[in-house]
């Protein structure tokens, strides 16, 4: 199998914050670029196996650690506005485009990263060729009481660092080794979800139907039907609202939130890789 070589780089993000990103370069001539956004509390390194699978198909991978995450600068998991994440991601897409101007660009996001990629894609629809979302946080307010939504919005604006919600690490995967590694990873944030990020995701969910109308590029959404962190209902709603005529939702029975880290990960990665290659 073709392997990819990983290298570390950085750029100045919004407000001058140092953003660290990795590039996985396949050993053969690349035929496409995947620009990847990880989820809340984690980091790009958790996608090494994903990048290797894509590399075997001749795909370059660019993946950043969001501000306040992993190796990047900024206060831990602190966010004032979703646009900070979106514009940092856009900078990375621009770097990939400058490095490889003739290659098609696929943008991919998981969970919160899926929300970031969705928001980016809706705002800048002409900058990429296709989009892949994994368990995307595009409907985070669904099922939350109006009172809690209002509280999160106020706190998120006035005191974005205040912790408001615990996330269940056992819900990321059915694989106990994945869960154990997640819990032991020093670059994963193990505290509560802060109000700033909660506010950003709630606002994104409330504006999702309007934003979705701007998505015209091919879209693949993958989701586990036993995802307790980001229920699949949001993905179903998203694919019904996008303007694109090339939309596919793949729901995997029994899988939890991180479909790339489930025991069935080979099946999922093969499906996603095949779809990407078919859209180059």
Swiss-Prot record:
Q: Does Membrane appear among the keywords?
A: no
Activity vs pH: Optimum pH is 8. Highly stable from pH 6.5 to 9.0, and still shows a residual activity of 50% after 1 hour of incubation at pH 4.0.
Q: State the reactions this protein catalyses.
A: Hydrolyzes glycerol monoesters of long-chain fatty acids
Q: Which domain of life is it from?
A: Bacteria
| Mutant phenotype after disruption | Disruption of the gene affects the morphology of the colony and impairs growth in the presence of monoolein. Cells lacking this gene are more sensitive to rifampicin and more resistant to isoniazid.
Q: Name one GO molecular function term.
A: monoacylglycerol lipase activity
What GO biological process terms are annotated to this protein in UniProt? fatty acid biosynthetic process; lipid catabolic process
Q: Report the EC code(s) recorded for this entry.
A: 3.1.1.23
Q: Which UniProt keywords apply?
A: Cell wall, Fatty acid biosynthesis, Fatty acid metabolism, Hydrolase, Lipid biosynthesis, Lipid degradation, Lipid metabolism, Secreted
GO CC annotation: what is one? extracellular region
Any idea where this protein resides?
Secreted, Cell wall
Q: Keyword check for Translocase, yes or no.
A: no
Q: Which residues form the active site?
A: 111 (nucleophile), 227 (charge relay system), 257 (charge relay system)
Q: What does this protein do?
A: Contributes to cell growth, probably by hydrolyzing exogenous lipids. Catalyzes the hydrolysis of monoacylglycerols (MAG) with fatty acid chains ranging from C14 to C18, with a maximum activity on monoolein. Is unable to hydrolyze long-chain diacylglycerol (DAG).
* Annotated family: Belongs to the AB hydrolase superfamily.
Record-given protein name: Monoacylglycerol lipase
């Amino acid at each position: 199998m073709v392997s990819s070589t990983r290298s570390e780089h950085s750029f100045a993000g919004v407000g001058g914050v140092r953003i660290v990103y990795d590039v996985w370069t396949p050993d053969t001539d690349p035929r496409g670029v995947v620009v990847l956004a990880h989820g809340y509390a984690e980091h790009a390194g958790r996608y090494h196996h994903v990048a290797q699978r894509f590399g075997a198909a001749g795909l370059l991978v660019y993946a950043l650690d969001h501000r306040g995450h992993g190796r990047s600068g900024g206060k831990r998991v602190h966010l004032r506005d979703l646009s900070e994440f979106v514009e940092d991601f856009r900078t990375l897409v621009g770097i990939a485009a400058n490095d490889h101007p003739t290659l098609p660009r696929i943008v991919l996001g998981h969970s919160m990263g899926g929300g970031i990629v969705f928001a980016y894609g809706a705002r800048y629809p002409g900058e990429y060729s296709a989009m892949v979302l994994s368990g995307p946080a595009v409907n985070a307010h669904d099922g939350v009481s109006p009172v809690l939504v209002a509280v999160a919005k106020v706190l998120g604006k006035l005191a974005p660092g205040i912790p408001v919600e615990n996330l269940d690490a056992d819900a990321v995967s059915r694989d106990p080794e994945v869960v154990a590694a997640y819990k032991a990873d020093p670059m994963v944030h193990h505290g509560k979800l802060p109000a700033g990020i909660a506010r950003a995701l709630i606002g994104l969910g409330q504006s999702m139907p309007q934003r979705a109308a701007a998505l015209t590029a091919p879209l693949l959404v993958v989701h586990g039907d036993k995802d307790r962190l980001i229920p699949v209902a949001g993905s179903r709603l998203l694919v019904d609202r996008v303007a694109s005529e090339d939309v596919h939702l793949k729901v995997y029975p029994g899988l939890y939130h991180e479909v790339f880290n489930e025991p069935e990960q080979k099946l999922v990665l093969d499906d996603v890789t095949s779809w990407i290659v078919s859209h180059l």
